[in-house]
Amino acid sequence: MKVMHIHFGTEGGAERFFVNLVNALHERGVEQRALIRPGRSWRKDLENGATIYEGVFRRISLSRFLLKWRMNRVLREFEPDVIMAWQLRASRFMPAHAKAFRISRLGDYPEHLGYYTNVQTLVCITPDMAAKVRELGWKRDIEVIANFTRARPAPPVARADLQTPADAFVVVGMGRFVKRKGFAGLIRAVKEVENTYLWLVGDGPEREQLEQLTDELGLRDRVRFTGWQTNAYGFLSAGDAFVINSSHEPLGNVCFEGWGAGKPTIASRAEGPSWVMTHESDALMVDCGDDVGLAAAIRRLRDDPALRERLSAGGSETLRTRFSEKAITDAYLDLFDRGVAKR
């Protein structure tokens, strides 16, 4: 099986899953090539699993024609069985290459279907997303395939390196600093829980506002901004709890990161976490935007070691039974086989 990936993403959970899947498919014997944007911090993590090409697709630019020419040359030389586009921009660039099975993986809810003209099958990461795509009028095939995380044991970072006391309760938040991720609410919630520190692993356009909020609340001594980390598990290993506070979260890799690191998770009732997680079984769930409820959940975890242990075990079991690397990789390989057989 030969697969050509097109991915014009930047930095974040979607990119982590892209790297995870490429490497998982490589280990299953799939030959792969990938077209990505230049300068990606995660390029080195792809190099063992795929031959990499770099380029930028812009709608109004002469460079798009050069990139299209390069892609056509790669397709002639590589002759892929499958072309897989990742998200909107890559789907717009999907070639009408009749010799390959053409799929697009949706990481979020599309506003319309105009970008998927050359796509035969849409892969949705939740049943709700698949239903919304049908409502928009998609008549071709849909598959629902979730994500997995490649949790790799990592030694904990030294708390002293982040000026954090050894006996503090440490909450870890992770992702791109955009409004919908709810980091401002997480900062406000942590303010209400004494002897609790917050490590924010990531970066993004909201960073300046988040740092300003931290200063306004007098929390500079308890909040740490670590920047992007290619392997965040060292920070998760050193923390005590993981929090997802998104107002909108289809099913990012972030939904599995705490479980993968063996940490108890608190999550907002956004779309993805609501499908994946069960309140009191493998996570504590709070309403979106409920800073008071989030603070209460953090305090509850801080004060109840038995609850932390129970939620960690429940999360590990959910990850193993529903969202394992093997199960998700098997689903993609089965989709590839069925699609290629129809050509």
UniProtKB/Swiss-Prot annotation:
InterPro entries for the chain: Glyco_trans_1 (IPR001296), Glyco_trans_4-like_N (IPR028098)
Superkingdom of the organism of origin: Bacteria
Keywords assigned: Glycosyltransferase, Lipopolysaccharide biosynthesis, Transferase
Name of one Pfam family that matches: Glyco_transf_4
EC number: 2.4.-.-
Gene Ontology terms for molecular function: glycosyltransferase activity
Keyword Transferase listed: yes
Gene Ontology biological process terms in this record: lipopolysaccharide core region biosynthetic process
Keyword Glycosyltransferase: yes
Family: Belongs to the glycosyltransferase group 1 family. Glycosyltransferase 4 subfamily.
Descriptive protein name: Lipopolysaccharide core biosynthesis glycosyltransferase LpsD
Organism annotation: Rhizobium meliloti (strain 1021) (Ensifer meliloti)
